[in-house]
Each structure stands twice: as C-alpha cells, then as structure tokens.
Swiss-Prot record:
PROSITE patterns: RRM. It is found in: Plastid, Chloroplast. Residues 91-169, 204-282 form the RRM domain. Residues 170-203 are annotated as: Linker (Gly-rich). InterPro entries: Euk_RNA-bind_prot (IPR050502), Nucleotide-bd_a/b_plait_sf (IPR012677), RBD_domain_sf (IPR035979), RRM2_NsCP33-like (IPR048289), RRM_dom (IPR000504). The lineage of its organism: Eukaryota, Viridiplantae, Streptophyta, Embryophyta, Tracheophyta. It comes from Arabidopsis thaliana. This is RNA-binding protein CP29B, chloroplastic.
Amino acid sequence: MAASASSLALSSFNPKSLPFGVSRPASVSLLSPSLSFKLNSDSVSFSIAAKWNSPASRFARNVAITSEFEVEEDGFADVAPPKEQSFSADLKLFVGNLPFNVDSAQLAQLFESAGNVEMVEVIYDKITGRSRGFGFVTMSSVSEVEAAAQQFNGYELDGRPLRVNAGPPPPKREDGFSRGPRSSFGSSGSGYGGGGGSGAGSGNRVYVGNLSWGVDDMALESLFSEQGKVVEARVIYDRDSGRSKGFGFVTYDSSQEVQNAIKSLDGADLDGRQIRVSEAEARPPRRQY
C-alpha cells in the first residue's frame, strides 16, 4: 500500500505566501468569500479572503491567498510558482497511536494549547483513504515543541494514549553504532538487532531509505507494523550531530512479513518523501574484542 498525507499549514497573513494548505478537500468549506482585483500597467493582482472551517471540529482560521500574474507584452500572464514552506526538523513532533477518526484539523486544535502550530500532517493510506494512525505536528519554536511533547505524550484521545516524540534522540543512544564500521548490528548490548526474539537473529529485516529527517523509530514502527509483527525499528543517527542519516532498518518476525513490507511500502509517502524499502543485507559475523 502507498501512503499520503493530509496537511494543514498555518501562519500569519503574508500577501506573498500561501500560508494554509489542505490536501483533503472533503473537510473544507469556504464561507463568505470576498474577491478583489487590482489592475496596474504591468501586473494584475488577484486575492481571495475567506474563513476556513472544519466540520469535524471547532478549529477555524482566517486564510489569505494572493497570487500575482506578470503581464507579458502579448497579453498573456505567467503564474509565479508558489514558494514551499520549510521548517527545521527540530520543530517537528511525531504523534503516534492516533485514533483513526482524528484528522489534521482536530490534531491542530489539540496542539494549539501548547503553542503556535505551523503545520499538521496526518498520514493516510493512498488506496483506502484510511488514517494510518500517526502524523506530524510542526511548532514555531523549540520551546513549544518541548512543551507539547511533555503535555501530550501519554495524553488520552478518544480512548487511546498518544505517543509524542520531539526531535531526534540524544547522541548517547547511538553509542552502540560507534564501535566499528558494521559490528554494532550484531552486538547484543545496544546495537541494532542483537539477541532476543526470533526475528532479531534471523535476518528478517528490511532497509528503509530516503527517510525524512523528522522520521524516528516510532514513526517507522507505526508504518511497518501494518505488514506484520515488528521486532525492532531503528533510524540510524549521526554519532556526532545526533541527526538522522536518512535511513533505518525494520526487523520482522518472519520472512513473509519482510516480503509483504517490501511489496506494500516501497515507494510509499512518509512525511513528504517516497521511501525506499528493500531486503537488508545479512549481518556480518560478530566481532570479538
């Protein structure tokens, strides 16, 4: 199966930006729109002001949209491409164990009590249209990210305790990855895929590449658990900076689950990027020190 994301981008009014985006139009209505046109000698400005309402919640925002068209000598206009908003990975929260009926608007409304919400994404299955049970929330500052993680990790929403994780784990979690080029994957202490569990020692694992920098262990586990029993899910981080290297590994309980994951999730959209899923190479023999 592939995945898609329903997202909301929230910001203050800016006449040269598109501060609000919604990819699931079924939950959006425009009320009392007003249109204005301004014609100059060299350009035409077109703007729409409207109030956005979500019928699923009381969350509402005023939205301003402005597009500028440059008029050519032949009378035709070229539309300037919109500028994409980008946010630091440090401002993004992973939110797992979401109730399947919770959409981006409801999630935004919930997290606004912790600070200014810039963007919200709930991940949906592209085929069925059903929520995958997790998403991402981007706040406007690191302090708000920390406050939201503290406030909502374990928070019960519609009978389900949320799992909220802020940013990459501290570098000390990666000690098991620093004692040799590849030997850490066979270490029973703290590296990836040590002892314990039939899947961990059997090589039933997949490589997951092209990960967004905001994806962590919990996001991987939430996505890949749909294809079978996940023994371990691990994103690989740089030892010095503590930031994601953009890839990771997921270990399953059986080889059949590995094949299911490759077939269903290779090319799936996760946090705005198409992930690459393939069978991982066999671990090298454990080194003796």
